[in-house]
């Protein structure tokens, strides 16, 4: 019985790490959704919540990384367990960056709150934000569920989000030429599109880390 105890303790610590990973993943998903919703309907209280959540995600990831490193040092895990712990560190870093990007989106949305945004660029951005939210959700659940098929789908999704970015860029630029006085605020649409593209890139990176965790092979 004594020989089994360290293994039982290890499994408990591993389970706790997974729980922490699930919590920060859910908070990141909700924070990103809250940020992109500000594009359609700005709300100062929600914007402040995004900023607050971004800081909370940073703290949560720091604690997760500390637990993961401590687990590696104390238990010296091997094979699949080691790859999972290392993946938690890597994915946590991506989630932290996504939290920062959500805050950037919220701050850019604030600059647009009193402006008359042309319909087509706004529709493009809404479509892009919905698609990126789907990518982020897919990347996170692929990791948590260790779903290879879902992780591999993200590669195709990345091409789609690049197309959506190009489309948004085209329509925003056209609107700028039609009304040069709008340039000062429409540039924020381009910033938001770029932030969304980066979130999409992070979702793909999470999927790639999932594939490596499962197969120990480069995606």
From Swiss-Prot:
GO terms for molecular function: protein homodimerization activity. The keyword GTP-binding does not apply. Its main location: cytoplasm. Coiled coil: none annotated. One of its GO terms (cellular component) is cytoplasm. It is found in: Cytoplasm. Keywords: Cytoplasm, Phosphate transport, Transport. It holds the Pfam family PhoU. It comes from the Archaea. One of its GO terms (biological process) is negative regulation of phosphate transmembrane transport. Plays a role in the regulation of phosphate uptake. Belongs to the PhoU family. Homodimer. This is Phosphate-specific transport system accessory protein PhoU homolog 1.
């Amino acid at each position: 019985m004594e020989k089994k105890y360290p293994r039982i303790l290890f499994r408990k610590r591993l389970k706790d790490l997974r729980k922490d990973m699930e919590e920060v993943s859910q908070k990141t998903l909700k924070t990103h959704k809250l940020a992109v919703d500000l594009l359609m309907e700005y709300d100062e209280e929600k914007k402040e919540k995004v900023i607050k959540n971004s800081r909370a995600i940073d703290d949560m990831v720091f604690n997760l990384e500390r637990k993961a490193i401590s687990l590696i040092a104390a238990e010296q895990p091997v094979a699949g367990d080691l790859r999972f712990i290392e993946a938690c560190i890597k994915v946590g870093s991506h989630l932290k960056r996504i939290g920062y990007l959500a805050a950037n989106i919220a701050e850019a949305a604030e600059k647009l709150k009193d402006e008359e945004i042309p319909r087509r660029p706004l529709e493009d951005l809404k479509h892009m934000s919905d698609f990126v939210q789907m990518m982020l959700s897919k990347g996170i659940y692929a990791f948590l569920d260790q779903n290879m098929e879902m992780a591999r789908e993200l590669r195709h999704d990345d091409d789609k989000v690049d197309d959506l970015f190009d489309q948004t860029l085209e329509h925003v630029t056209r609107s700028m030429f039609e009304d040069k006085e709008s340039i000062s605020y429409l540039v924020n649409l381009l910033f938001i599109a770029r932030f969304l593209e980066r979130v999409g890139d992070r979702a793909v990176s999470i999927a790639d880390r999932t594939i490596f965790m499962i197969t120990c092979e480069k995606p």
